[in-house]
Amino acid sequence: MPSIKSDIEIARAAAKKPIFEIGAKLGIPVEQLVPYGHDKAKVSAEFIAAQAGKKDGKLILVTAINPTPAGEGKTTTTVGLGDGLNRIGKKAVVCIREASLGPCFGVKGGAAGGGYAQVVPMEDINLHFTGDFHAITSAHNLLAAMIDNHIYWGNEENIDIRRITWRRVMDMNDRALRSMVLSLGGVANGFPRQGGFDITVASEVMAILCLATDLKDLERRLGDIIIGYRFDRTPVHARDLKADGAMAVLLKDAMQPNLVQTLENNPAFVHGGPFANIAHGCNSVTATKTALKLGDYVVTEAGFGADLGAEKFFDIKCRKAGLKPDAAVIVATVRALKMNGGVKKDDLGTEDVAALKKGCANLGRHVANVRRFGVPVVVAINHFVSDTDAEIAAVKEFVSRLGAEAILCRHWALGSAGIEDLAHKVVELAESGQAKFQPLYGDDLSLFEKIEIVASKIYHAGEVTADKAVRDQLQTWEEQGYGKLPICMAKTQYSFSTDPNLRGAPEGHIVTVREVRLSAGAGFVVAITGEIMTMPGLPKSPSAERIFLNDQGYIEGLF
């Protein structure tokens, strides 16, 4: 039996075309591409602005059930579906997020897809790429430096150092940096205070970059950032410290979407990368809107399960950007359904139809949740070699009883040839006119009511609890004019509840909001639940231990 090639071996063997040829497929002139080598480029802001009057293509969201720690192949399916649509004669563009170094060297791996459904150059995309994350990290930390510098030179704004909310960021999983004391070492180093680091993908600057529509909107949003509070409890904004202009300068190039290609030489935008468990989990509005002007179909993803990424895609990204999705694909795997049915991780390779049927309740809820937004749904069964015919048949039967269709997809092994059936179904749904998109809640409800609606309607929680301090903070923000903002729930990706070990489709559980954060620049309020950390840690055996350069100088172990 021939050995199975690794993702990196497949990517390295790709017959890539020059990036100018990929741009030409979308009608992008050579002079409007800013090349980063031969196989990646940024699309100029000038070209993007010129597309404003064009008709939009169809928008397809790829989401998933609650995942296993390794993920269920959502990006792989997004890329595969884009290739599949092109294979059946549709002009399709893929839009995905950039990879964070934290997961690359941690547990989950990269974010370029897998098998024969990848975007390339895979190594570049998963590592430094075009420097967007560096720019975001730099802009965020410039503001942090200017806060402490302002205090050092007299604190004209009367910032209460006990109430500074702006932390520092870096693009790595490092639990040692979560909480620390800054400015130690004497008078010359400033005023000691408590601080810490978050991961770059949790930065409000990342969210702002992904929600801003142009450079002017970007600078306005950066100025709106609240960095902390004065002694009189009034908010201090980034523009009060005159930081917004310099931050925008650092982000000028990062605002331009990155164009790459799939293994089958189809265009893909890879831009922005907020996590979906601690941020809004979608690629940039700029990339998505540009792709909609250039392609007949745009296939995009939202992070983790539909309870997180899809809800935020609908309630934050689509609401803010005026997007209206035409269809949604929910990625399910036999192994994740079995895990949701109670099977232990080490036993997922063994057939267990009974556990799978039990775990299908998780899939059923995700289907119902997406339909709640008025978007038609198809289920993609991302095939693994350990799947049995009986297990696949059980999933198809369950989904058919919901009035939907589950389609087996082999894009990981076969590329676009393995996902044609799904591509045809997506076209059927998108062209049917069934989509009647609407957000889950209205702008005028109170912030706490919005949290309760997400918790009850999407998570099926029985109650939402929060300390008086949390409720008072929400009320204060409403009084300051932030009451119309949407909610961004920070929650475990492994369960509908706030307990990562509570699998399946739990009912009546309690959602406790332990902290709320106002992202005034991004335009949402973050409600933090459970044990979610905005700076992750590495696992006991991180994937970094297995990544190295071989004798030829090639990277091994990246996935």
From Swiss-Prot:
Metabolic or biological pathway, per its Swiss-Prot or TrEMBL entry: One-carbon metabolism; tetrahydrofolate interconversion
UniProt keyword Nucleotide-binding present: yes
Catalysed reactions listed for this entry: (6S)-5,6,7,8-tetrahydrofolate + formate + ATP = (6R)-10-formyltetrahydrofolate + ADP + phosphate
UniProt EC number: 6.3.4.3
Protein keywords: ATP-binding, Ligase, Nucleotide-binding, One-carbon metabolism
Coiled-coil annotated spans: none
Domain of life (superkingdom): Bacteria
Enzyme class of the recorded protein, top EC level: ligase
TM annotation in the entry: none
Molecular function terms, GO-annotated: ATP binding; formate-tetrahydrofolate ligase activity
One of the protein's GO biological processes: tetrahydrofolate interconversion
Keyword field contains Translocase: no
Binding site residues for ATP: 68-75
NCBIfam families: PRK13505.1
Family: Belongs to the formate--tetrahydrofolate ligase family.
Name assigned to this protein: Formate--tetrahydrofolate ligase
Taxonomic path: Bacteria, Pseudomonadati, Pseudomonadota, Alphaproteobacteria, Hyphomicrobiales
